[in-house]
Amino acid sequence: MSDSKHVTYEDAGVDTAEGGRAVDAIKQMVKDTNRPEVIGGIGGFGGLFSAAALKDMEDPILISGTDGVGTKLVLAQIMDRHETVGQDLVAMCVNDILASGAEPLFFLDYVAIGHIEAEHMAKIIKGVADGCKLAGCALVGGEMAEHPGVMAPADYDLAGFTVGVVDRPKMLDPANVRPGDVILGLPSTGVHSNGYSLVRKVIGVDGIKPGTPEAAAKAEELSRPLEELGGASLADTLLAPTRIYVKPILELLRAGANVHAIAHITGGGITENLNRALADDVDAVVIRNGAEMGWDVPPVITYVSRQAELAPNEACKTFNMGVGLCLIVAPEDEAAVTEALVALGEKPFRVGECVEGSGKVVYSDEC
C-alpha cells in the first residue's frame, strides 16, 4: 500500500488514556464488592477467588450463568439514565443460578461501547457494583471494549457472567415437584429486563438516536406523569431495576425451608419459565380470570399490554405479569414458607398449584 501513512490506535478511534481513566474511576466501586475469598484487585489477567471455603460442603457443585440486559438499554440511552442497568445485568445472572439454590460467589461484566468516557462508564459500573452488593457476590473482573466505527459513540451493550455454588444434597431439582404442590410468587418491580422489544414499539422509541433533539423530546415525553401509572412516569417505571432475590431466598433455604423448585420469570414470561421448574409429569395451573391475574399486576405491565392490545395468553408469555420469582412447595409447607418470607420482608402470594400433566403451564380460566 504505497499511499499508506502512519496511523495510531487513537487515530483509529480507540482512546486508551480515557480507558485508563475509566478503570481508575471504578476501582473503589469494585473493591467495595469484595468478599474474603477475593485475592488481589482488578488489573490482572484474571480474577482470583479462593475455593478453600468449599471444603466445608459435602459435595460442592459450581453453577454458572450468563446473560445481558437486552433492548432495555435502548431506553436507558435515550433517557441518558445509566445508573441502574448494571443492577439489571447482575440480576439476570444471579437470579438464574438462584433457581438451583446456588449462592453467587463472583461476577464479571463485559461492556461494548462506541466511545469510552470515564464518567459515563463509572455510572454503568456503579450499577453493576450495586447489584453485586445486593447479591452478595464479588465483582472480580470485567472488560471495557471500545468499538469505534462499529457502534455509535453513545451506544453500548452489556453482558455478565456469574459463578455460584450449592451443596449437591441441597440443590433444588424440578424432579421433586409433585401434583398438589403450591406455587408461590414474589413480586417484580415491573417489566424487569424482558419484553422491551415490544415496549419500544409501544412507546415509540424505535429509530431514535441517543443525544439527538428527537431523543431529548422523547425523554421529556416519557418523563411526564401518567394517571394510568398512579402518577408515575413511563421512564421511571420502565427503567426500574430488576429485583435481586438472592439474600432473602438463601436465608430462607439456610433456615431449612422445604422448597422443591424455583423459577426465575424472564424472557417468555410465566408461560415459558415456570415450566422449567416442573417435573415431566406435572403441570402448573396459574390463577387467571380473563385479563385479570390472581394477584396485583404492576400498572406499567397492564398499560403496555393494553396499548399493544395483547391477548391474555400473549401477555403471559411476554411479561412477568408482576411475578419475578416462583417457589414451588408442598401444600403442608405453604404456611410456614409464606410466614418465613414475610419475616424476611417479602410479600409472597399464591400463583397457582401443580396437577398431574406433562410439564406445561396452563391457566385456570382455560381449564
What residue ranges belong to the model's regions?
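Glycine-/charge-enriched secondary-structure boundary and capping motifs
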Residues: 2-11, 120, 124-138, 151-158, ...
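N-terminal amphipathic/basic leader segments beginning at the initiator methionine
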Residues: 2-37
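Hydrophobic alpha-helical scaffolding
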Residues: 12, 16, 80, 189-192, ...
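Residue-level signature of catalytic and energy-coupling elements of molecular machines
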Residues: 15, 67, 180, 264, ...
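Hydrophobic face of alpha-helices
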Residues: 23, 122-125, 196
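Buried hydrophobic packing segments
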Residues: 26, 48, 93-94, 199-202, ...
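Glycine-rich phosphate/pyrophosphate-binding loop regions near the starts of catalytic domains
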Residues: 28-189, 285
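Short, acidic (Asp/Glu-rich) active-site segment that either coordinates a divalent metal cofactor
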Residues: 66, 157, 170-230, 234, ...
